[in-house]
Amino acid sequence: MFRGASAVNLDSKGRIAIPTRYRPEILEINQGQMVCTVDIRQPCLLLYPLNQWEIIEQKLSKLSNFNPEERSLQRVMLGYATECELDSAGRILISAPLRQHAKLEKSIMLVGQLNKFEIWSESEWQAQIEKDMTLGASGQFAMSEALSMLSL
């Protein structure tokens, strides 16, 4: 399970180092294999261990090619999906199209979301967190039926 936000740097070759606390799980369960794709709702990337990505692929494959919205989701998520392998230094290479989508430069935030990571530019991450905190302070979370039942 991946939790917490880590500041990491993007090197000149487009690689980021996965924090050491996550590497054993990625190596043991997935032999270092991961898949990175775009988030269609946010200017960030989604990085899945291979076993978790395979679950997503199964869900995407069940969508209809004849429904325009479902086909669009398949096209974007599968079209951008790129296999990434953890190298001996614990780094993954993020392809240029993925870096461009998320506006990645040197300062990156790697954010654990239990079964995956989100990869954000530091500036986009800060802007998103401000929006999320403002939304939380406004009480709008309580308007969601599922969230109104959540006790933290």
From Swiss-Prot:
Keywords attached to this entry = Cytoplasm, DNA-binding, Repeat, Transcription, Transcription regulation
Cystine connections:
none
- Where is it chiefly localized? cytoplasm
Q: Per the record's keyword annotation, is Disulfide bond included, yes or no?
A: no
Instruction: List, alphabetically, the Gene3D superfamilies matched.
Output: Transcriptional regulator MraZ domain
Instruction: Output one GO BP term.
Output: negative regulation of DNA-templated transcription initiation
A GO molecular function for this record? Answer: DNA-binding transcription factor activity
Domain of life, source organism: Bacteria
SpoVT-AbrB domain segment(s): 5-52, 81-124
Pfam families cross-referenced by the UniProt entry:
MraZ
Concerning InterPro entries, the annotation shows: MraZ (IPR003444), MraZ_C (IPR035644), MraZ_dom (IPR020603), MraZ_N (IPR035642), MraZ_sf (IPR038619), SpoVT-AbrB_dom (IPR007159), SpoVT-AbrB_sf (IPR037914)
Provide the protein's localization: Cytoplasm, Nucleoid
A GO cellular component entry from the record: cytoplasm
Q: Which PANTHER family match?
A: TRANSCRIPTIONAL REGULATOR MRAZ
Q: Which family does it belong to?
A: Belongs to the MraZ family.
Please describe the quaternary structure of this protein.
Forms oligomers.
Descriptive protein name = Transcriptional regulator MraZ
Q: Which gene encodes it?
A: mraZ
